[in-house]
Amino acid sequence: MGNGVASFSGCCAGTTAGEISGRYVTGVGLVQENLGHSFCYVRPVLTGSKSSFPPEPPLRPDPIPGTTTTFRSISGASVSANTSTALSTSLSTDTSGIASAFESSNRFASLPLQPVPRSPIKKSDHGSGLFERRFLSGPIESGLVSGKKTKEKAKLKKSGSKSFTKPKLKKSESKIFTFKNVFTNLSCSKKSVIKPINGFDSFDGSSDTDRYIPEINSLSTIVSSHEKPRIKEEEDKTESALEEPKIQWAQGKAGEDRVHVILSEENGWLFVGIYDGFSGPDPPDYLIKNLYTAVLRELKGLLWIDKGESYNRNGESNIEKQSTVEHASDSDQENCPVMNGNDVACGSRNITSDVKKLQWRCEWEHNSSNKSNNINHKDVLRALQQALEKTEESFDLMVNENPELALMGSCVLVTLMKGEDVYVMSVGDSRAVLARRPNVEKMKMQKELERVKEESPLETLFITERGLSLLVPVQLNKEHSTSVEEEVRRIKKEHPDDILAIENNRVKGYLKVTRAFGAGFLKQPKWNEALLEMFRIDYVGTSPYITCSPSLHHHRLSSRDKFLILSSDGLYEYFSNEEAIFEVDSFISAFPEGDPAQHLIQEVLLRAAKKYGMDFHELLEIPQGDRRRYHDDVSVIVISLEGRIWRSSM
């Protein structure tokens, strides 16, 4: 969305240069720095658990009733269409910043998106002629997460885990191996992928909660300039902890899209943030730097508590907002039950903490027969909303000194998984789409009806091939855009004196999304007046035209849930929800060792090229910025909710 940031610095995690060059010899000279990246994470086999799983049958019966699922694997990919722009708050005038980049802790693996050489496309030798490869192998198929890592590889991974937000002290601490380095011996960019916003890196003050909130920067050996020097003993402890960090993290950007993934295998939780910016990189950069820590702070006492503290289960939530929450469980309901919060405006501080002191509630309640019943899901959702409010409030403080920030904003999609509980918060038009198997009894009744009706040969083949494995999409969040009639009616009702509140299918003729983080000039007259006259809108009245009021939703995973697709809206310019889950399901059935998120990115580009009468390579040859006319920045994350999707990943 918007005109944003764009260039590349990929991280080839978990492998050596020799291994990559040997595997991708056909890609020499074809490296594109500004395109995108593909990454993956595979849950390690825990002590005492099975080290392998039986192959998946082509037609799988419905899983045993009563079984539960949790995430096992994460496949992610992003592609940029926008050009690179500098932060508005940055003193640098350098516009050569990278537009597509990725960095992570040691258990994530990533590779840049690299098109195959121009040549007649060969059909895959995996036994299926339905898919054509346009990119080189992603990290899953490449085996970057297979087998045991040697000490040398672990060191490479450690050196490649750098901070998005903190300045570097040593070159050795920021060394990173890129795909381009493998082939051309060129050095990787030494600039941080996400620059701090000057003057608002952190706020003064602290609380008891602050000491126990893990922040991504706490996993790095990089220290900020205002921190006290550590003694050698402390540094040794830190380096020892970094060998196997308590939490795993990944951060990436493609154009103005930002992706943030943080997880803990030990405590069974996963945080995913997708921030789709518009008009500038500042809001998504600010979100990736601040929202996660704000969420953890608000969740204290709900999902985690400090050691030595007890949790009052009868305590009331300290958020007094009136909202209605609905929960989805393993039922026949296939619609999108959600909760819409009140108008919000957001803020947080940057706090470094000791991850070892963090204890999630499940550790204190392990004797409970049903842990989910001990969590007030309504309070968790409201805590997410509160975190978003505080993050936007602190971002608004910057607008006083930098009025141009009032033009910029971002869509927000946050997914928090804790065991079998999934919490989704969103503003804007990004989507969380669950792929779910339909009810078995319904399917049996449907098959009985199909026996007595005349079917076409194609329908018969489809039913035979897909059987009971046919998946149904369940969108877990509401979309906030002018494409939703309910949103258009709301804005017109709130602005009865402004006949141009919605113009050319956009809010005030400017923005297609009806809710967003930032974009203050559409929320308060004072931010509109602070802009140069050429950028102002005709602000009628004082009511906001757009809000940051999020869609909130809780879902309890069941045996029927197969995978979850999280994506910015660029995916849905060319896919419906049904098409997206069918594409992923078909792909992983044909290629258990493939990268489904990368495949979706490829299909978006193929459909965009076909729509405008070009081939795949012709589209990618169009310069960034100009290519935005054909497709948006796209970020996709596919989360497996079963024991295993990809054989090569185990």
UniProtKB/Swiss-Prot annotation:
It is an enzyme of class 3 (hydrolase). SUPFAM superfamilies: PP2C-like. It is found in: Nucleus. Binds 2 magnesium or manganese ions per subunit. Its main location: nucleus. It catalyses: O-phospho-L-seryl-[protein] + H2O = L-seryl-[protein] + phosphate; O-phospho-L-threonyl-[protein] + H2O = L-threonyl-[protein] + phosphate. Mn(2+) 2 binds at D276, D569, D632. One of its GO terms (cellular component) is nucleus. The keyword Methyltransferase does not apply. This is Probable protein phosphatase 2C 36. It comes from Arabidopsis thaliana (Mouse-ear cress). The gene is PLL3.
